[in-house]
Every structure is written in C-alpha cells, then in structure tokens.
Design a protein with these regions (language model features):
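Single conserved hydrophobic/aromatic residue that forms the stacking wall/gate
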Residues: 1-7, 11
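Hydrophobic "anchor" residues on beta-strands that sit immediately upstream
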Residues: 14, 25, 120
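Class I S-adenosyl-L-methionine
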Residues: 157-201
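S-adenosylmethionine
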Residues: 34, 40-172
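Positively charged, low-complexity nucleic-acid-binding target-recognition regions
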Residues: 14, 74, 195
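Conserved class I S-adenosyl-L-methionine
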Residues: 13-20
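Glycine-rich SAM-binding Motif I of class I
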Residues: 24-28, 35
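A short acidic Gly-Thr/Ser loop motif
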Residues: 20-24, 182-183
Length: 201
C-alpha cells in the first residue's frame, strides 16, 4: 500500500507531521510502525471461530505480537487539515487503532503549517484527480513548498499524481518512486534532510 511505502523510514524518527492529514491514515500507520504494532492486532477475525484452528493458537500468536510491540518508543504524530470533519474522523481513527495517545489531529490551513526540525513530513496533498481542480492543487503544492523551505531540515515525502509537483513545490526531489493510488498512477517525491537542487525554470 502507498501508506506503508511512505511510512517505511519512520522507525528512525520520533516526530511525524502531515499537513493534509484527511482521515489520518499516514500518521496513524507511521505510529503503528514506530511502535511495531502488528496489523489487525486489535481486530477479531471470522477464522477465530473455525473448529480446525484451536483457540490457543490465536491466543499465542496475539500474545507474541503484543510482546514484540515497542510501546516505549518516543513517537509523536501530528496531523492537520482544513476540514473539521476530517480532523474529527482522524482523531477517532487513531483511538480505534490504539495510537490515540501518540497522534494528535488539529484543524489548520497548510499556510500556517510549521515543519519541525528533525521531523519527517508524510503527506498525500490533494491533486487534480481527487480535488477536481488542477489549479487549486498546484497552489496547495506551491504553498507547501514555501512553508517547507522555511524549515528544510525536515525530511518530506509527498504522494501525488501531479506530474509537475516539483515545479509547483519549488524544489527537485532527491528521489522519486512510482506507485499507484488505487488505479491512479502516482509518485512519492522524497526530500531528505539535506539541501536539494532547485527546479530549473
């Protein structure tokens, strides 16, 4: 999944931010990875009622997963979105995922976003296919770039289908990776904790 790919660097980090958090997926999955929480740990499955799988097997595996978790990890996750309903949903999702005490979501505009030094920014900014307005998506990417350049020591991973993202953002990515968001071809634009070359006009 795109979320898991983008969160793969989190084990090194203690602070993750997302200025376009939506329902909180990126920050929540980053928290689960940092804490080494097994997928589905808090869920129940129909297969648990199968006669040919002893209940003790499920209990043993669930206990192993709990023992492997790193609940002492110093992780903090912060998400921001201009939509109050999305923020409310993100906070609810974090609680359901068992990371409500590690993730906080607030209503805020991207222009007011303040990247923290030494953090990693994971984000899936709105783009044409999702937003319905390519010009507005470009403006959001431009604002994100301006905000990020105020604190370029923060690493940033942006998932988008915008082929001109680098030009709108104002910086050439250190690395890119092609992925799919459902049926939409996208790329992860990676900006590491070091200066990167500006895009040539």
């Amino acid at each position: 999944r795109k979320e898991s790919s983008a969160a793969s660097d989190v084990y090194k980090r203690q602070l993750v931010q997302d200025p376009f958090c939506g329902s909180g997926t990126l920050v929540i999955e980053a928290a689960q990875k940092a804490l080494n929480l097994a997928p589905g740990l808090r869920r129940r499955f129909a297969a648990e009622h199968y006669d040919f799988v002893p209940a003790a097997v499920w209990a043993e595996e669930r206990q192993k997963a709990l023992a492997a978790s790193r609940l002492d990890a110093g992780f903090e996750g912060f998400g921001f979105d201009i939509d109050p309903n999305a923020v409310a949903l993100a906070n609810a999702n974090a609680k359901l995922a068992g990371v409500g005490d590690r993730c906080r979501f607030e209503v805020a505009d991207v222009k007011d976003f303040a990247p923290r030094p030494s953090s990693i920014i994971l984000t899936n900014p709105p783009y044409g296919e999702r937003l319905g307005d390519a010009a507005e998506a470009a403006a959001l990417a431009r604002t994100l770039g301006q905000v990020w350049q105020a604190s370029p020591t923060a690493g940033l991973y942006a998932i988008t289908a915008d082929a001109d993202f680098e030009a709108h953002f104002g910086k050439k990515a250190a690395k890119r990776r092609k992925i799919y968001n459902g049926m939409i071809p996208c790329q992860i634009y990676m900006y590491f904790d070091r200066p990167v070359k500006p895009v040539r006009k």
